[in-house]
């Protein structure tokens, strides 16, 4: 009964849904695209976890890239 509870976090969701033997297709799972990181996975679901300060840094980073400069922030 404990296994039927709703996972509390996205990470827990990922762990529960990624079962199976690595490198073998079990037939029950469709091939999933590989994501760079958990944030990329969440973005693919349409979930944006960036808070306001990170959004500002991301905007500054994109602007720097468009102007041909090396961005100050990696995210």
UniProtKB/Swiss-Prot annotation:
GO terms for biological process: positive regulation of viral transcription. Residues 1-30 are annotated as: Disordered. Residues 35-49 are annotated as: Core. It is found in: Host nucleus, Host nucleolus. Keywords: Activator, Host nucleus, Host-virus interaction, RNA-binding, Transcription, Transcription regulation. A motif (Nuclear localization signal) lies at residues 55-63. Gene3D superfamilies: Transactivator Protein (TAT, TAT EIAVY). It comes from the Viruses. Its main location: host cell. This is Protein Tat.
């Amino acid at each position: 009964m404990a296994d039927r509870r709703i996972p509390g976090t996205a990470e827990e969701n990922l762990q529960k849904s990624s079962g199976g033997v690595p490198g073998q297709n079990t037939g029950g799972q469709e091939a999933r695209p590989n994501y760079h990181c958990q944030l990329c996975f969440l973005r693919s679901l349409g979930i944006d976890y960036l808070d306001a300060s990170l959004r500002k840094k991301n905007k500054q980073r994109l602007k720097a890239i468009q102007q041909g400069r090396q961005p100050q922030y990696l995210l």
